[in-house]
Amino acid sequence: MGFRIAVDAMGSDAAPAPEVSGTIQAAREWPDLRFVLLGDDSRIRAEAEKAGGLPGNVEVVHTTQVITPDEEPTKAVRSKKDAPLTVAARLVKEGQADALLSAGSTGALVVVGTLGIGRMKGIDRPALGTIMPTVKQPVFMLDVGATPDARPEWLVQFALMGDIYAREILGLSRPRVALLSNGTEAEKGNAVVKATYPLLQELPSIHFIGNIEARDVPFGGADVVVADGFPGNVLLKTYEGVAMALFQSLKEALTGSPLTAVGAALAKPGLKKMAKRFDYTEYGGALLLGLKAPVVKCHGSSNARAIYSGLRVMKLALEGRVIDRLAEAIAQLPAKNPKEEGDPPA
């Protein structure tokens, strides 16, 4: 059998239904992979029955606790040793699982990934990276929420990880890497962005094209967009909200009269294609890069399709040896200044 993926079945808003259904779909499509659903055994099996039962490559590990989004992440991870997240991280650390997926608390996932699984050597902070649709080909953006208040040297690490992901997963031979800012000029941005710009210019292994404004991201102005976790998350949520508002407005406009309804029927194939392109459930979750094993964060509002897509991201990361390739690339970075060698707190 192939890779073994641990799935937090109690993380989403509608848990465990989306996690169970999405995992079963993935298990049936990829019989060479193994899946472990962690959570309330009886609830998981009840949902599985609705989906036709558990395939042979899916097992259930019963847990008795749950980490909720309103809990302080570090305290919750340390006190709830029998929550799906903490048990899953333990399975990964002990080599009983190769990767972890959760639609639960982002903060708790970052903590459990950092403390439970561990950062890869040379990485100070992990970054959540996700695929975002554009009018051209998709763009990979990081960080979208794992590390707010990032330092310039951390953004350089994010850029390097994003470049590797774009090469190995998106298949781009020379990804265009850009830094999110409030202007394209080198002198634009806050202090961190201004300090990061020359560092990226000096990094020979990536194709840095300079700053990019948020409005240019949907038009495919770059292949990889690097940002601090705070503005990155704001851009991601704005992106999703505008897309949903646009499609809702379009639907109302096209169904407002018999004449527009006829036009909508004629345009339906094209509209469905466009809607699919901008549907976040098609792109799965965000990969938490910088850890010793693949970790994927799905939306709390994920449905079964989004969980399945997140598992597809995981499958690609495992088969593409993304973690190994990231470690190899990070090892090529210049050695840190001795005064910077202290391991930052989680």
From Swiss-Prot:
Subcellular localization: Cytoplasm
Gene3D superfamilies per UniProt: Isopropylmalate Dehydrogenase
Xref: Pfam families: FA_synthesis (PF02504)
Catalytic activity reported: a fatty acyl-[ACP] + phosphate = an acyl phosphate + holo-[ACP]
GO biological process: fatty acid biosynthetic process; phospholipid biosynthetic process
CC annotations in GO: cytoplasm
Molecular function terms, GO-annotated: phosphate:acyl-[acyl carrier protein] acyltransferase activity
Record has Transferase as a keyword: yes
UniProt enzyme class: transferase
Family: Belongs to the PlsX family.
The protein, known as: Phosphate acyltransferase
The species this protein was found in: Symbiobacterium thermophilum (strain DSM 24528 / JCM 14929 / IAM 14863 / T)
Phylogenetic placement of the source organism: Bacteria, Bacillati, Bacillota, Clostridia, Eubacteriales
Underlying gene: plsX
